[in-house]
């Protein structure tokens, strides 16, 4: 790629990542020059080494580390994979390339053929499946404290955003209020986006892309001065980071709207406190003060303090019976430390008692105007959300 076409922020990010990779991995050469076994100490990416920081409301990686030595037969292949992947990423950085995680898998996949002193031939693949190379990339992230986005490694775009906002991406200014019926796809390197100007009072993140499209076409974000985002299901890293930046840098409150079921709750928790599998990223990806707007169990059934939004007839029409997997997942979530607040325990208890769930679309079935101009704004105004 011509350097003239590369933005200044891209060049700076590329240089920073390349310098960091070089500084970290050159230590292996120093160990060899000192006649020491080349060894890496990498933080463990395990459930047992994941902690919930009650004060910061984040899932974080603990302090346990594993030693990966080239001379340890149990670790030598993983050592080789780590060094190989780091070299491929480094080459891409210094050559102005933007590889995808799939590209990296193919670039590194080959067979290593060796002969022992007796002439016997051995053949070993660098990796067989992409999940192997993906895991190695994660190891490099925790080893270097560089996220793959920092290393300009691309992934498929998933999240979308629309609103009264201008951003700079590369050398272009993009107006997110002029997307027609479409929306801006959140790029896989959201830290390279500059916020130019914005006219909004809050961020609404919607789990379902279909509901996002309905709210967009209804003009919800225009009427209520909102930045409207969809994660299109489980959020990818880019969407989580983009939402975090909107909250942290622009001080916009964040509200999450999901289905009323355990999977919707978990999507909310991933946005708010991070995920167990990627706890090492939570400090940069999670939004600890994000609020669960709904759809809540009390929205459906009400309680002693609140009337339901659905009538008895509407409940019969829209409610879905929870499956065994839903019950099991709810029971698991109930025991997570970050769900042990009074409000969340109340929410989960209603679900387990009623054994019922509801999709966001049910609220739209009462009428799109009800969802966009009554349900959502009423809940925000009355602070009817769970934290």
Swiss-Prot record:
Pfam families to which the protein is assigned, alphabetical: TOP6A-Spo11_Toprim (PF21180), Topo_VI_alpha (PF20768), TP6A_N (PF04406)
Keyword Transmembrane: no
Gene3D superfamilies, sorted: 3.40.1360.10, Winged helix-like DNA-binding domain superfamily/Winged helix DNA-binding domain
Known partners and oligomeric status: Homodimer. Heterotetramer of two Top6A and two Top6B chains.
Binding positions (Mg(2+)): 207, 259
Active site: 106 (o-(5'-phospho-dna)-tyrosine intermediate)
GO process terms (BP): DNA topological change
Family: Belongs to the TOP6A family.
Origin: domain of life: Archaea
Protein name in the entry: Type 2 DNA topoisomerase 6 subunit A
HAMAP family according to UniProt: Top6A
Keyword tags: ATP-binding, DNA-binding, Isomerase, Magnesium, Metal-binding, Nucleotide-binding, Topoisomerase
Organism: Sulfurisphaera tokodaii (strain DSM 16993 / JCM 10545 / NBRC 100140 / 7)
Functional summary from the UniProt entry: Relaxes both positive and negative superturns and exhibits a strong decatenase activity.
EC number: 5.6.2.2
């Amino acid at each position: 790629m011509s350097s003239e076409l590369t933005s200044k922020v891209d060049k700076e990010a590329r240089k920073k990542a390349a310098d960091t990779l070089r500084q970290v991995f050159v230590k292996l050469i120093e160990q060899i020059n000192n006649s020491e076994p080349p060894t890496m100490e990498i933080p463990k990416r395990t459930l047992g080494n994941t902690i919930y920081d009650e004060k910061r409301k984040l899932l974080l990686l603990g302090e346990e580390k594993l030693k990966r030595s080239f001379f340890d037969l149990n670790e030598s292949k993983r050592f080789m994979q780590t060094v190989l992947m780091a070299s491929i990423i480094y080459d891409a950085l210094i050559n102005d390339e933007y590889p995808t995680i799939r590209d990296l898998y193919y670039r590194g996949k080959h067979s290593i053929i060796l002969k022992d002193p007796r002439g016997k031939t051995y053949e070993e693949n660098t990796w067989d499946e992409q999940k192997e190379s993906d895991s190695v990339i994660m190891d490099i992230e925790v080893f270097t404290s560089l996220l793959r986005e920092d290393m300009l490694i691309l992934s498929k775009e998933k999240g979308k955003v629309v609103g009264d906002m201008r951003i700079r991406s590369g050398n272009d200014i993009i107006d997110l209020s002029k997307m027609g019926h479409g929306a801006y796809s959140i790029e896989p390197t959201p830290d390279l986006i500059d916020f130019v100007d914005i006219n909004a009072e809050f961020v609404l993140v919607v789990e379902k892309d279909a509901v996002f499209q309905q709210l967009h076409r209804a003009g919800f974000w225009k009427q209520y001065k909102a930045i409207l985002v969809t994660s299109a299901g489980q959020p990818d890293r880019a969407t989580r980071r983009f939402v975090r930046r909107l909250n942290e840098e622009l001080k916009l409150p964040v509200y999450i709207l999901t289905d009323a079921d355990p999977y919707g709750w978990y999507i909310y928790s991933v946005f708010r406190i991070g995920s167990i599998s990627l706890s090492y990223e939570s400090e940069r990806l999670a939004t600890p003060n994000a609020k669960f707007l709904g759809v809540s169990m009390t929205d459906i059934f009400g309680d002693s303090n609140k009337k339901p939004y659905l009538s008895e007839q509407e409940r019969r029409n829209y409610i879905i019976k929870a499956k065994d997997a839903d019950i099991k997942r709810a029971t698991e979530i109930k025991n997570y430390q970050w769900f042990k607040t009074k409000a969340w325990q109340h929410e989960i208890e209603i679900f387990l008692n009623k054994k019922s769930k509801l999709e966001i679309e049910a609220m739209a079935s009462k009428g799109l105007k009800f969802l966009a101009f009554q349900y959502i704004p009423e809940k925000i105004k009355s602070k009817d959300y769970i934290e």
